[in-house]
Regions:
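Flexible phosphate/Mg2+-sensing switch loops adjacent to catalytic phosphate-binding sites
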Residues: 188, 195-211, 553
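Long, positively charged leader/targeting segments at protein N-termini
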Residues: 2-3, 38-186, 191-194, 222-668
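E2/UBC-UEV (E2-variant) core
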Residues: 204-208, 217-220, 400
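Membrane-entry segments of alpha-helical transmembrane domains in multi-pass membrane proteins
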Residues: 165-167, 209-213
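N-terminal chloroplast transit peptides
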Residues: 2-14
Length: 668
């Protein structure tokens, strides 16, 4: 039996199989809480980020030293250490400065990108490049995997055209058949980084200790530079470049302006540039970094590559004793492409290996897919580098809040609190019908309540029981309340659609151009996907409004909640996944703020298996460092005073929209 995942957002990936005794489901940190959705984000540690810990100046080597290194292409670059360090310091200072004022984020991005391009130009030809193509190293990868205890029977690596490389069945494989396993010793993990040449620096640097994804990125770079590395067959098989927004040209990023995803894209670039500058200085000045192979060559392109490699591939696995989770790169398994379905991979602690069962029946020569999780297309584009056209989990986010200056604020906040909903919150509009979750339905109902209705839900008969009906579409507060909330949704969606610089029709026309670059196509697809969700929300709001207006005009009786109707609360049409409003199910679906231990499930069986998601963002940051590593720009939630005020200004939204599949990253 396959175990369906509760939710996955920014992780590609996998959860448990039916033979599991214990299935642990993990979620990523999300923008709704303290940790941002940007990969590898950290803010200025006082006295650290602007100037990494350093040894005396004498340990930096001769100031007249000149670096020259040839790449695989034969190009070379000559630049003095002092000149490079000045540029790096300028970049670090720019990226560590206070967040720009609203509307100035693009200007800041241009400035940061300009500095990065100066650095890249001076570093041209200094990056490590393997000869040949990645395809040349696939046979070596398969042999290495087999020699080290992985299963290699039943599939091979093949090119699937627009989807890129993936796993191809070499025999018939049945659904739920265990066809792939990877032992721990093959994985690149935070623990293996601690036991490597990076260990000394790790033990002394707080950022590495707090952010496993950063550690994994530097671990990958150090091993790539080591010709005797155990993981070299795996590293050589990785793409030489990616299609994450870190690789977009400026004009390609510009196509995302006005979308709800653009802020995450800009933050991702800024954070990556800041981290590169910080670690460049650290590698050059810290005594514990003196033996790192990065000391002689550590380019921005190198770091961008390692960040993208980790961001598109990392996953959480249990430590050897099973007491906690750690981050890992999983060779061979990460060749699987994504499709809709269920999580079918887990970690078997007894055999100490990752195990993957078939999502469905596969015939010989068919591509073998896995399900990366319930990610939005914005998450796929930003963290995986592809757009998934048939994404049944696509959504955009909308920030809503009850204005504290509103006369009824205290009453509304109290009703919402009893329902487990904050007075200001990030919600999601979904691509499917209905477009709103039970939590959002409950919020809008409370938001639109009159004073008498609020009193009824606070002090009236069966007030406690009524709270349970707030997220259930079967039990309206009143016809007037339903009309108000659906009018609000209709108006809000219409206003948000007006913020885009292009229409859906114009986007579709642009996508027909044959000379469109891959990244431009993905950006436009993501932009269009956001609009389509808003258009569906508008249409749904209008249809619902008209329906309830008709009921009101006809004098239809209002359905009343009875205790005998409890079954309806567990099978509501409002959202099959989100039935009871007291559960913060919107957070579960979007991966926002859910602690890992809340995803622990006990199943019948004998083995211990951890279910996992392939992460795109990294592991949670410890509480004591969260404030220090949350230097991203987050728009304040909209404070909405009344229905009239709502229609006069737009809601400040941050959504994860999506775009279409990226041939490279979908396959890699």
């Amino acid at each position: 039996m396959l175990i369906s995942a509760l939710h996955v957002t920014d992780f590609a990936g996998f959860r448990g199989v039916g033979s599991a005794a214990h299935l642990w489901l993990f979620s990523k940190p999300h923008v709704h809480q303290c940790v941002t959705s940007d990969f590898l984000n950290f803010a200025s540690f006082p006295g650290v980020i602007t100037q990494p810990p350093s040894c005396p100046a004498s340990t930096m080597g001769k100031k007249s030293r000149v670096k020259t290194q040839k790449s695989g292409s034969g190009a070379s670059a000559v630049v003095s250490p002092k000149e490079m360090m000045n540029l790096i310091s300028e970049l670090l200072q720019k990226c560590s400065s206070a967040a720009p004022s609203a509307g100035k984020e693009w200007e800041e991005y241009i400035q940061i990108r300009g500095l990065v391009e100066k650095i890249r130009k001076k570093q041209k030809g200094m990056s490590v490049v393997f000869e040949g193509t990645r395809e040349d190293y696939f046979p070596e990868l398969m042999s290495w995997a087999q020699e080290n205890g992985a299963s290699c029977d039943g599939f091979t690596i093949a090119n699937f055209g627009s989807e890129g490389f993936g796993l191809q069945a070499t025999r018939d494989i049945k659904a739920e058949e265990l066809f792939l396993w990877i032992p721990r010793k093959m994985l690149m993990t935070v623990e293996s980084a601690q036991n490597s040449v990076l260990g000394s620096l790790y033990s002394q640097d707080r950022i590495l200790q707090a952010m496993g994804n950063v550690t994994l990125a530097l671990h990958l770079l150090c091993e790539r530079a080591n010709s005797a590395s155990f993981w070299l067959p795996y590293i050589r098989s990785l793409p030489q470049e990616y299609d994450t927004p870190l690789y977009y040209q400026q004009e390609e990023v510009q196509l995302l302006l006005g979308t709800q995803a653009v802020q995450d894209v800009l933050n991702q670039y800024k954070n990556t540039a800041r981290q590169y500058a910080y670690f460049y200085k650290l590698v050059q000045t810290h005594p514990a970094a003196s033996k790192l192979p990065l000391k002689d060559s550590f380019t921005f392109d190198d770091y961008r590559w390692s960040v993208s490699s980790v961001m598109t591939r990392q996953n959480q696995i249990p430590t050897e004793d099973g007491s906690r989770v750690t981050l890992a790169l999983i060779p061979l398994w990460d060749m699987c492409n994504h499709t809709n379905g269920l999580i079918t991979t887990g970690y078997n602690l007894e055999d100490d290996r990752c195990e993957c069962v078939a999502l469905q029946d596969y015939k010989e020569n068919e591509q073998i897919y896995i399900f990366y999780g319930t990610r939005s297309n914005a998450e796929f584009v930003i963290h995986n580098g592809f757009f998934f056209q048939d994404n049944s989990h696509d959504r955009v986010k909308i920030k809503l809040g009850v204005s504290k200056s509103e006369r009824l604020y205290a009453m509304k906040a109290e009703v919402l609190a009893r329902a487990g909903i904050p007075a200001s919150c990030v919600f999601a509009l979904h691509c499917n019908e209905p477009p709103i979750s039970a939590q959002l339905l409950a919020f809008l109902r409370v938001f639109c309540m009159t004073e008498e209705e609020l009193k009824d839900y606070l002090l009236g008969d069966h007030a406690i029981n009524k709270i349970f009906t707030l997220g259930n579409s079967e039990f309206p507060v009143s016809w007037e309340n339903e009309i108000k909330l659906w009018t609000f949704l209709e108006t809000r969606a219409a206003l948000l659609l007006k913020t885009y610089k292009t229409t859906s029709e114009e986007d579709r026309s642009m996508l027909e151009k044959p000379d469109l670059s891959l990244h431009s196509r993905v950006a436009i697809q993501l932009r269009l996907a956001e609009k389509q969700i808003l258009e569906k929300a508008w249409a749904s709001g209008r249809a619902k409004r008209l329906n309830f207006q008709k009921k009101q005009e006809e004098g239809a009786p209002l359905p009343r909640y009875e205790e005998s109707d409890i079954a309806l609360l567990e099978n509501t049409n409002a959202d099959a996944k989100l039935p009871i409003i007291l559960r913060k199910l919107e957070e579960v679906e979007d991966g926002q703020g859910i602690q890992m231990d809340e995803h622990t499930h006990l199943l019948n069986g004998e083995k211990v298996v951890y279910g996992m998601d392939m992460e795109a963002n990294g592991e949670p940051v410890h509480n004591e460092t969260q404030e220090k590593v949350s230097k991203d720009i987050q728009s304040p939630s909209d404070s909405i005073g009344s229905l009239n005020q709502k229609s006069q200004r737009e809601v400040s939204d941050i959504s994860d929209g999506r775009t279409e599949e990226n041939p490279k990253e979908n396959s890699e």
